[in-house]
């Protein structure tokens, strides 16, 4: 990085590996808009509030590197835990207000503090011009934008549209943990989203009830939340 001059623009995509077309679309966007494209691969332990989730997270580093090579990603940063965390270091505490009080923030305590901790560390190391994140994790995207403001940084955050399977299922590294039958059943989530998009006039209470009813009648779904939120605050909208 020390060889990169200030005249060069740096595009950065932080990932936890197990790369799929969603990740690769971020790299492609960076290649198009920036002089230098950097991707990091690091499974961040502080954003997992479930030890089994961390232990089972897919590790496909060789395949990941091959995919990045095919896209001509300029630099791949693959730090070890000790490169980023002191021994015994915990996640940093942040105050993102209402951005973290609903949805993933409610059901995965500590997740966003861990995510923001590692993103801040990576931003300080890479010092990108633009950082690319997927819109699939919309709550995370809004928190990263808030993080940059708290850092008083000039890093630009770009959200890239969700990449989906032909079935409509959003591309996700954790899809690899699903059986083929479970993947087919998960399409119901996309169908519910489309229904809401096409029936906005029915009103928020009706749409939330519709999603809840559709998902809860399937025994393989355990619904944690179904929310319609204000983009800038992530606060649920009830009417």
Regions found by a protein language model. Give the residues of each.
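Nucleotidyltransferase catalytic core that binds NTPs
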Residues: 1-222, 228-235
